[in-house]
Regions:
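Active-site beta->alpha loop and helix N-cap motifs at the rims of alpha/beta catalytic domains
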Residues: 2-122
Length: 122
């Protein structure tokens, strides 16, 4: 029987930016280490606070790999893969390197408001 790895204090990591609008990877590393040192039970990456809709695929990949590299399997990681475009969500899921990621956080399409059948198919 599978155990629920996502329990306790889950931290939705923010994506820090430099004043020029670039992802601040040194600051991201400090944030991950801070949470590891201060009692987090799992990470949620690239969700709303992680600015996923505003990031390129390359930035999301590098953020994912940076968090995995620092975490080294110590805490479970939940990765956000969601949006209104089902095809794009499926492509992101296929594209992601899932080694070191323990689950997917997704959402129902919120803009185009599909039917129940549409939600099921999404």
């Amino acid at each position: 029987m599978a155990r629920n790895r996502f329990k306790g204090l889950g931290v939705a990591l923010v994506t820090p930016f430099t004043p020029d609008g670039e992802v601040d990877y040194p600051a991201l590393k400090r944030l991950v280490n801070y949470q590891l040192d201060n009692g987090a039970d799992f990470f949620c990456i690239l969700a709303t606070t992680g600015e996923a809709p505003c990031l390129t695929t390359e930035e999301k990949d590098r953020i994912t790999e940076t968090v995995k590299e620092i975490n080294r399997g110590r805490l479970p990681i939940l990765k956000y893969c969601g949006g209104n475009n089902t095809r794009a969500v499926v492509e992101e899921i296929k594209h992601t390197n899932w080694e070191g990621i323990d689950g997917i956080l997704s959402i129902c399409p919120y803009y185009n408001k599909p039917s129940q059948e549409g939600l099921y198919k999404h």
